[in-house]
Amino acid sequence: VPSALITGAAGGIGSAIAAALAPTHTLFLGGRQSARLDALAERLGAPTWPLDLTDADSIESAAEVLSELDVLVHNAGVLYPGRVAESIPEQWRASFEVNVTGAVALTLALLPALRAARGHVVFINSGAGQKVSPGMASYSASKFALRAFADALRADEPSLRVTSIFPGRTDTEMQRDLVAYESAVTDGAGEYDPAKFLKPETVAGLVATAVNTPPDGHVHEIVVRPG
């Protein structure tokens, strides 16, 4: 049975990805220890994989016990809403530390295991990694950088499959925070309507589709938006 490590597994999209891959893969549920991660592990019968993408030692410890890894899903991410003039350098550093540098560091640490399995690396990017919208300055910049890293990895590691997925707005806690920010700056009512957004399960299904594509196919990118 192939193996899959999912970062940010306790989140809305992460837990949906875990559920989507559970029937076909041995899972490692990556993330900081939390009751939510423990509950997901119990529900799926999969081990938690303690991981802090801002801590180099945590990344090395998580990677060193895996000799082979078939699938790595980079799902962890942070968002600090704000226009350029509102932002502060610390938010930019924090955005890049998790969204880019953490993903790069974990990929490098797991590269021997991925090469050994001729594995697949999936990056959960964002529509913000293709087009910049007001109030998404540091997040968009980090997602554009993540897209470039995925493209570089694909070019430099021909034995691996590398897929970037660019979901539009998805019903998650991060989305609720973004809507609250947008409502505050526009004096809106702040009403959150999940029906306007993609379901996490929809994004997870696309991950499963990419991962389960036969060996003769290599899915480079998937773009999906709310219908």
Task: Map each language-model feature to its residues.
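Conserved glycine-rich cofactor-binding loop
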Residues: 10-11
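Conserved glycine-rich Rossmann-like NAD(P)H-binding loop of the short-chain dehydrogenase/reductase
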Residues: 24-39
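Conserved NAD(P)H cofactor-binding loop of Rossmann-fold oxidoreductase domains
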Residues: 75-80
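Substrate-binding pocket helix/loop in short-chain dehydrogenase/reductase
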Residues: 83-84, 91-93
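Active-site helix of classical SDR
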Residues: 107, 142
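Residue(s) in the substrate-gating loop at a strand-loop-helix junction
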Residues: 126
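C-terminal helical subdomain
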Residues: 160, 164-167, 183-227
